[in-house]
Amino acid sequence: GCIVAQFALADPYLSLRHLARAPDGTLAVALQAEHSDPALRQAAPALALLGSDGLNTVPWPLEGAAPDCWQGYAGDVCWAAGTFWVSATYAGQVMGWSTTGEWRGKLPLAGAGALMPVGNGAEGFMAGGSREALAAPTGTSATGSAGPHKRYRLARGWDNHGTLLSI
């Protein structure tokens, strides 16, 4: 094959780690910061979107600050329930953004790692954490206002990769 296009972020210390695609073709890239300065890692974005205007990082919400203990580490990304979901392992959250980078909010999950869409994502998603798994059905709001979310206790925590075989 041949290279058709190449994309890079301006910050060479942002590592492109995990990918998810929305039905409209937008590609989400979960990021991991490799800065030697802890303050720069903490301030780093979690997500970049590849669309018609190229590859661009997505800012944190209006407050502009990353969640406490973020440490620049996104464990996974998936498309489900109309949202790109990113796991923030050290911050203990699953965070949501739209295909245009609008903040949708967050769901708490200690040690959040693997994210798996249910079906094609239209039915929601599952997230694995260090002590429990979270099942978030269609209509899930990242503010936690919709649901209901089901939580399952885990004998072992899940890492940052997973595939849902059945539910």
Where are the language model's segments positioned?
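Short, solvent-exposed loop/turn segments at conserved positions within beta-propeller repeat blades
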Residues: D37-P45, T89-Y90
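Short coil/turn segments that connect the beta-strands within blades of beta-propeller domains
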Residues: D24-T26, A81-G82, G121-E123
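Surface loop/turn motifs at the tips and blade-to-blade linkers of beta-strand repeat domains
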Residues: F7-P12, W60-W70, G105-A110
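Short loop/turn segments immediately following the C-termini of beta-strands
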Residues: Q32-H35, T89, S130-R131
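Repeated scaffold domains used in trafficking and secretory/extracellular systems
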Residues: Y13-A20, D68-D76, A110-A122, H149-I167
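Beta-propeller blade signature
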Residues: G1-C2, A43-G54
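Short loop/turn segments that connect beta-strands within beta-propeller blades
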Residues: G51-G54, S98-T100, G139
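Residue position within the beta-strands of beta-propeller blades
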Residues: V29-A30, V86, M126-G128
